[in-house]
């Protein structure tokens, strides 16, 4: 999986960047998404607040914002078009590969790791996997959806070795 990592805060250690990259690749393998692309941006609470207001109309910072990429209009080309211009097939594959972007608030991750009594590394991993599952179509609006998503989330984190202890 190709993952673009951006640290807008200047506060994310190389270890956390590498853990996030490794964990998301692990999650991609577990969910059959190895051929996909996404981005992860680490932000402050202030930036998280702005994004939450812009995309979710919620006037407060949040821990992770998941923006699933869904093309509004499918790009369709005829076989003649594809034969005449092979770059069209490459372009279609690129659009199909990109699944979305995550914005993880470093400030919220620190607050929540203390609140829940586990490591910052575990909280960062939790937020990355939680957001990853959202941009892959998982949600928790109903009890059934919540059970499915949270079970898979915990399975991934446990198999990776990021437990709550």
From Swiss-Prot:
Set out the biological process GO terms recorded for this chain's protein: rRNA processing
Question: Per its Swiss-Prot or TrEMBL entry, what cofactor is needed?
Answer: Zn(2+)
Entry keyword set: Cytoplasm, Endonuclease, Hydrolase, Metal-binding, Nuclease, Ribosome biogenesis, rRNA processing, Zinc
Q: What is its EC number?
A: 3.1.-.-
Name the principal localization, coarsely classed. Answer: cytoplasm
The compartments listed are: Cytoplasm
Q: Which InterPro entries match?
A: MetalPrtase_cat_dom_sf_prd, YbeY, YbeY_CS
- Top EC group: hydrolase
Its cellular-component GO annotations read: cytoplasm
> A single Pfam family, by name?
YbeY
Sum up the protein's function in the record's words: Single strand-specific metallo-endoribonuclease involved in late-stage 70S ribosome quality control and in maturation of the 3' terminus of the 16S rRNA.
The family assignment reads:
Belongs to the endoribonuclease YbeY family.
HAMAP family with a match to the protein in the record: Endoribonucl_YbeY
Q: What is this protein called?
A: Endoribonuclease YbeY
Q: Which organism is it from?
A: Streptococcus pyogenes serotype M1
């Amino acid at each position: 999986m190709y993952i673009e990592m951006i640290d807008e805060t200047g506060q994310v250690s190389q270890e956390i960047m590498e853990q996030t990259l490794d964990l998301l690749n692990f999650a991609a393998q577990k969910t059959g998404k190895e051929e996909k692309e996404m981005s992860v941006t680490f932000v402050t609470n202030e930036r998280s607040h702005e994004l939450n207001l812009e995309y979710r109309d919620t006037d407060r910072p949040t821990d992770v914002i998941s923006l699933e990429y869904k093309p509004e209009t499918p790009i369709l080309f005829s076989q003649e078009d594809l034969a005449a211009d092979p770059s069209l097939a490459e372009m279609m594959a690129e659009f199909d590969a990109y699944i979305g972007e995550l914005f993880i608030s470093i400030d919220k991750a620190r607050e929540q790791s203390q609140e829940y009594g586990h490591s910052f590394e575990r909280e960062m991993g939790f937020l990355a996997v939680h957001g990853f599952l959202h941009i892959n179509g998982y949600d928790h609006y109903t009890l059934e959806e919540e059970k499915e998503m949270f079970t898979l989330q915990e399975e991934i984190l446990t198999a990776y070795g990021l437990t709550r202890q």
